[in-house]
Amino acid sequence: MKVLRTYYIFLFSTVVTSQEKEAIKYEDLYERNGLIYASDQDSSFNGTVDENWPTGINKLSYIYKDGKPDSKWSDWFNNGQPKEEVEYSDGIKNGLHKQWYKNGQQKFERTYKNGIHDGKWTEWYENGQS
């Protein structure tokens, strides 16, 4: 009987946790007093915003914590090539910031520490020359 009860608890918890949360679109977010909120929430937004181009290719992936950008943000061109990656911590650029041309060639790479440019700043032309 104890094994059966454990099985049902496991089954129920699996069903509950496997239900996907409704995706939040970037356009459903708004700014208030410097923080980001979802249109249906009273508290600042915590979570991920993932969107695709109509073709199904990734368009963007943003993470928010306490209404501020957090972790790595990524954008892609509609051809699937990466467009931009930015690392945030508590709403401030902290780490690498990279951008690409639509042809896939890297455009620039910069490093930030606490929102301030720190270190080497490298830029490339669309043909790959620096």
Positions of PLM-derived features:
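Glycine/tyrosine- and acidic-biased, solvent-exposed loop/turn segments at the edges of beta-strands
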Residues: 14-130
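Sec-dependent N-terminal signal peptides
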Residues: 4-14
